[in-house]
């Protein structure tokens, strides 16, 4: 796929990814790979893979899980990605915030790189144990990855992620969230947010959720969100959860209230929540760790192997996530 090879020890690689219209030309992202025992040699036939995705404005694992804990407790290779627009948001200009679109492509390409790299080296691993998690912006990218790769993940854990690109966040409206994605309402502006662009980024989109279910989506989704979160508004997370349930997806939610605050895992009902690593291990571990009552394996081949298009219609056309080459590329087709 790429010239880079899997490192023998914990390390980083740079992989090619999809072009960004705001900066035409080849684009690469940095991928951080963390092995059980910090060594590729420690990977065994039960080892899984987990995307561990940083927050809006962060890099590597900021706002996400501690990879040394995840690799040990869950027996996984942890994969973090400096996806599009990683790093300080206030220091960036010239484009609105991608909000999980090409960011998900970057993360999924990193996952495919490790998946295919293990296969190329003929290293046994458990390809039925594939997960994603992230905090805040990383929770958003986690759920967008699940949307763009509906056959790939065994389970995903969204910790206080953005459920949708609301008008409030897109246009920095007064009141509401403090987030500002810097989109424009002017159809002639390069920063214009199209109707479809908003619809594809809506993770509680009832029509798209029904399509995921119809395609045989079997991923366990866990949403962990503070009931007092005003940054990624709690009401949006609650609505997304209800829409996922209504579509028949396998989803559960932990909406953190004052009664849950233990000073250890849950320290706040706001956006920061508490110890996100332990949330992944303790709550996500219920279905990720072998031997637990809710433990499960995925039955379907991954999108990496299926090499089929995943299509989401919108009011102005359709989005096609093409897996034909075993790595994803997304495009919009106007109607």
Regions found by a protein language model. Give the residues of each.
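N-terminal cap/lid segment of alpha/beta-hydrolase-fold proteins
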Residues: 1-48
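Phosphate/oxyanion-binding active-site loops and adjacent basic polyanion-contact surfaces
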Residues: 22-29, 99-108, 232-233
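Short, surface-exposed "cap/lid" segments of acyl-processing enzymes
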Residues: 28-73, 80-91
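Active-site loop/turn elements of alpha/beta-hydrolase fold enzymes
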Residues: 81-85, 161, 258
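Alpha/beta-hydrolase active-site loop
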Residues: 95-122
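Primarily recognizes the serine-hydrolase "nucleophile elbow" in alpha/beta-hydrolase
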Residues: 113-175
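The feature captures the conserved acid-bearing segment of alpha/beta-hydrolase catalytic domains
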Residues: 167-245, 252
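C-terminal catalytic histidine-bearing segment of alpha/beta-hydrolase fold enzymes
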Residues: 238-335
């Amino acid at each position: 796929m790429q010239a880079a090879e899997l490192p023998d020890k914990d390390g980083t690689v740079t992989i090619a990814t999809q072009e960004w219209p705001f900066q035409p030309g080849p684009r690469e992202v940095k991928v951080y790979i963390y092995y059980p025992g910090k060594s590729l040699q420690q990977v065994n036939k039960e080892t899984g893979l987990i995307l561990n995705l940083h927050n809006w404005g962060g890099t590597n694992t900021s706002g996400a899980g501690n990879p040394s804990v995840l690799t040990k407790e869950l027996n996984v290779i942890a994969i973090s990605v400096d996806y599009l627009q990683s790093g300080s948001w206030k220091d960036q200009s010239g484009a609105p915030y991608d909000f999980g679109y090409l960011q998900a492509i970057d993360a999924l390409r990193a996952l495919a790189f490790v998946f295919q790299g293990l296969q190329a080296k003929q290293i046994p691993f458990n390809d039925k144990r594939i997960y994603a998690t992230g905090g805040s912006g990383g929770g958003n990218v986690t759920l967008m990855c699940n949307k763009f790769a509906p056959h790939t993940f065994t389970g995903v854990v969204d910790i206080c992620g953005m459920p949708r690109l609301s008008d409030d966040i897109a246009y920095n409206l007064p009141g509401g969230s403090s987030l500002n994605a810097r989109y424009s309402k002017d159809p002639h502006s390069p920063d214009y947010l199209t109707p479809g662009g908003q619809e594809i980024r809506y993770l509680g989109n009832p029509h798209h959720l029904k399509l995921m279910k119809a395609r045989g989506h079997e991923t366990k989704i866990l949403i962990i969100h503070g009931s007092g979160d005003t940054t990624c508004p709690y009401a949006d997370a609650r609505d997304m959860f209800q829409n996922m349930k209504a579509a028949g997806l396998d989803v559960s939610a932990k909406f953190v209230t004052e009664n849950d605050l233990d000073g250890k895992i849950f320290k706040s009902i706001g956006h920061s929540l508490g110890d996100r690593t332990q949330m992944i291990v303790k709550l996500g571990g219920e279905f990720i760790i072998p031997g637990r009552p809710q433990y499960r394996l995925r039955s379907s081949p991954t999108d990496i192997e299926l090499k089929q298009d995943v299509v989401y219609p919108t009011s102005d056309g359709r989005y096609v996530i093409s897996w034909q080459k075993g790595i994803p590329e997304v495009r919009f087709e106007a109607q």
